[in-house]
Amino acid sequence: MKFSFVSLFPNLMEFYFQDSILARAKEKKLFKLNFYNPRDFSKNSYHKVDDYKIGGGAGLLMQAEPMYEVLRSIQEKKENPYFIFLNPSGKTFNQKDAKRLSKKEHIVFVCGRYEGIDERVLEIFANEVFSIGDFILTGGELPALVMCDAILRNVNGVLGNMESLEEESFENNLLEAPAFSKPFIFEKKNKKFYTPSEFLKGNHARIASLKTTLASCKTKFFRPDLFLEHERKK
């Protein structure tokens, strides 16, 4: 699988893949990375890529010409690119999207800055437009990294134990069950906090049943919207 990032600040993104799980996956050649800076495709001597909006409005907009050139250059490599634009007006990214997109050959994340990207670029290239929530960020780099991380976790071999993926939050519209580590009794300020005793008895069927019950209770409390969806699909 291949990921390409189109960004005015590629150096902000490269470091994310230098440690931990994703670094090991990259060393195993489970995915490849490319970074493209639209400034390298600007035709003016100052490598300018932004200008004021036609019709007025606050802030600057990333221009169509350099964005077209960089995305067209990616298309011409014929690596089956799937263009994803990051925009607050896009649909909200979720775990189902992460699973679906993990089957793509080559995902290109197009990261805007300033007040966004000339709309005509999206009309020409966008396969999908995503947001990670109803809030505004300085640029599309962080959402792109968030999405890339979530997608890669669904690529076979990236996680050491694929069973952990099946147990994670949002599978079957349930949050992941509460998890506990040693010690069995955690004591602070004369208060004792216990791990559920069923977890220590070794009966895997009963442990699995308890985890499902706890996951259901947790979802009902923290995400009633998900819980209703889970109940509806039973």
Swiss-Prot record:
InterPro entries: Alpha/beta_knot_MTases, tRNA_m1G_MeTrfase_C_sf, tRNA_m1G_MeTrfase_TrmD, tRNA_m1G_MTases_N, tRNA_MeTrfase_TRMD/TRM10. It is found in: Cytoplasm. One of its GO terms (biological process) is tRNA N1-guanine methylation. Specifically methylates guanosine-37 in various tRNAs. GO terms for molecular function: tRNA (guanine(37)-N1)-methyltransferase activity. It comes from Campylobacter jejuni subsp. jejuni serotype O:2 (strain ATCC 700819 / NCTC 11168). Its main location: cytoplasm. It catalyses: guanosine(37) in tRNA + S-adenosyl-L-methionine = N(1)-methylguanosine(37) in tRNA + S-adenosyl-L-homocysteine + H(+). Signal peptide: none annotated. HAMAP family: TrmD. SUPFAM superfamilies: alpha/beta knot. Its EC number is 2.1.1.228. The gene is trmD. S-adenosyl-L-methionine binds at residues 112, 132-137. Disulfide bonds: none annotated. One of its GO terms (cellular component) is cytosol. It is an enzyme of class 2 (transferase). This is tRNA (guanine-N(1)-)-methyltransferase. It comes from the Bacteria. Belongs to the RNA methyltransferase TrmD family. Homodimer. Keywords: Cytoplasm, Methyltransferase, S-adenosyl-L-methionine, Transferase, tRNA processing.
